[in-house]
């Protein structure tokens, strides 16, 4: 078992793993690759990879089989019936924490929903899901999307500030799956300094921004404030 698991783990993209056997018990340490919950495909989920390797190594366990069938290493929610996409992007699923308490195994999952899929529709998609397999889905929190159409005066004002300062007219305004404090107020847009072609290692070790990028962002923000005041 240990040798087969070692072989399976060696073929993965885990940053690090270690198997320790003591008193007849096998402990597994696995280190994945962190990523923002809205872009889980960029990272490597240590739990998902480990469960997949356990099954590949011949470990028989009801939960491992259940997890691999319904969640696994996929990030599209298809295994639990939540796969969805619209013109603005795909639904993403990111498993965060798995724990055992009082004989019950639970997974805390972060799902980022495309803007056209409403909260009530998500609730219907989750209702009674998995109960015929001794499982249950519970929505702990669900928020309304923050969205402004491309022709919105707010979007136009911010985009003009960006193009006037940077000269970049090739890259257009886009939506992201990240949650922001802009949701706390009405008529607010999250407007950040991330530029195409640079991996800022967001929510990972060594997250950074270039000094030149920060200086340019200040100029963009100055123009943005002037444009917003003119609306």
Put a short name on every predicted segment:
Residues 1-48, 208-210, 216:
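Fold-level recognition of mixed alpha/beta catalytic cores in primary-metabolism enzymes, strongest
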Residues 24, 102-103:
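Intrinsic-disorder/low-complexity loop/linker signature
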